[in-house]
Amino acid sequence: MSILSFLLGEKKKSASVAKERLQIILAHERSGHSAPADYLPALQRELVAVISKYVKISDQDLRVSLERQDNLEVLEVKIEIPQA
């Protein structure tokens, strides 16, 4: 966020905020300071809240999982979106 944006009170879009949060989570996880996947329930709640602004979904419609294999980590998000 630039100083001008801060002074004018411009707000970040939810997509950029979500991207920043995911980057922080991944960086934190890679540094080894966190227990494995302790943030997933909070991440799932936040994703449901953001997606619910645009599409009607419930907690059961979104699943978040983290898989580890050797030195590779995969964050998987599955969303069931109802048909219109």
UniProtKB/Swiss-Prot annotation:
Query: Any one Gene Ontology biological process term?
Result: regulation of division septum assembly
The disulfide bridges present are none
Keyword Cell division assigned: yes
Alphabetized, the UniProt keywords read:
Cell cycle, Cell division
NCBIfam families attached to this UniProt entry: minE (TIGR01215), PRK00296.1 (NF001422), PRK13989.1 (NF010595)
- Spell out the HAMAP family in the cross-references: MinE (MF_00262)
Q: What family is it from? A: Belongs to the MinE family.
Its function, per the record, reads: Prevents the cell division inhibition by proteins MinC and MinD at internal division sites while permitting inhibition at polar sites. This ensures cell division at the proper site by restricting the formation of a division septum at the midpoint of the long axis of the cell.
Q: What is this protein called?
A: Cell division topological specificity factor
Q: Which taxonomic lineage does the organism of this UniProt entry have?
A: Bacteria, Pseudomonadati, Pseudomonadota, Betaproteobacteria, Burkholderiales
